[in-house]
Amino acid sequence: TGGGAPLCLVNDRKARISAACELLWADGEPPYYSAVYPEHKYNFFLYYKGDAEEYAPEQRTQGSITKFFRIDGTQDLISAYARPGTEDAERLPDNDETKYLMNHAGDLVYSTKSARLHVEPHLRVKHELAQVNFKVQAFDDLAAQGREIRIQAVALVIPTKAQFTVAADWAGVSHDWTDETNVPPTGIVWETERDTVYLPHENTPEEFGSTYQMENAMFNPEPGVSDPKAEPMKIGTQLLVPPVDEMGVIIHYRLITTRPDDLIPSGSLFTARYANLHFEGGFQAGKQHEVLLKVYGPQRVDLEIDGLPGWIDGGDVEIPE
């Protein structure tokens, strides 16, 4: 559907969510509920991919639908399934129909019989990616040395190909509507292949894949740091990344110096590369994280995440590039 609207897949039929949050079916006829079989049970699933690229045809089996998406750090992949909660039960009238429904909830939700009691699909939404923001700060008094470090571009080396099971066979809602451990086998398996994805900024082109090219993500003006007393400076916008605990980091930067006797010429370019970095706990799906670039000088840039100690394993700096 246009505009990257979420898709619901119900018995091979498609729908989109309108601007008014209405479910609009492609052929105009809702595929549920059955008037002939009022106790026939349905499951509902939803996914959202933004403008993620489909790199392989979808796979449909008797028990699942799997899509294959490639991300570039700007898309939020979302999954959802329908199940009622305690609040849905509290809205039900106190009558025999409700008692029957609650005694047979595992067999009747969602169905024509439950719909007549206004038990509508209650979607539980999950963000499958983590949001990562970046800041930079001087950790040595570069200003006193007549030096400044300017950041040109930052990249993460991460998996970008997702095998996304968007719908799957599931027994569905149990009799206990508060049992949140009963979930369908949907979600993402990430391929091990990695790509270099650059941190975008406001002027990075919006076309898919633009963040794979450094020239699309070079900061202009370049954020510079020299005073360790200054607050950390936010750089770029954000990256949406898989929930991984190992990745690579690449930082491109330049030295600006006013010292005529400096052994490194002003304008010299550097690249700090950190390969196979492991961080305890990793990035968590649906959560925000912050990576701080700690600049000590042209030959040392450390990394810190969420205010915790630095990454396990180190990196190397090419001087100059």
Predicted regions and their residues:
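Short, low-hydrophobicity acidic/polar segments
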Residues: 1-150, 158-160, 196-211, 215-219, ...
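Long, low-complexity, repeat-rich, intrinsically disordered, solvent-exposed domains used
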Residues: 236-243
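Solvent-exposed, low-complexity segments and loops of surface/extracellular structural proteins
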Residues: 115, 179, 186-198, 205, ...
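Intrinsically disordered, low-complexity repeat and linker tracts
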Residues: 283-321
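Cysteine-clustered segments with highest specificity for TGF-beta superfamily mature ligands
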Residues: 231, 243-254
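Extended low-complexity, serine/threonine- and proline-enriched intrinsically disordered segments
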Residues: 1-7, 144-190, 195
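C2-type phospholipid-binding modules
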Residues: 267-290
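Extracellular low-complexity Ser/Thr/Asn/Gly-rich intrinsically disordered segments
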Residues: 4, 258, 269-277, 306, ...
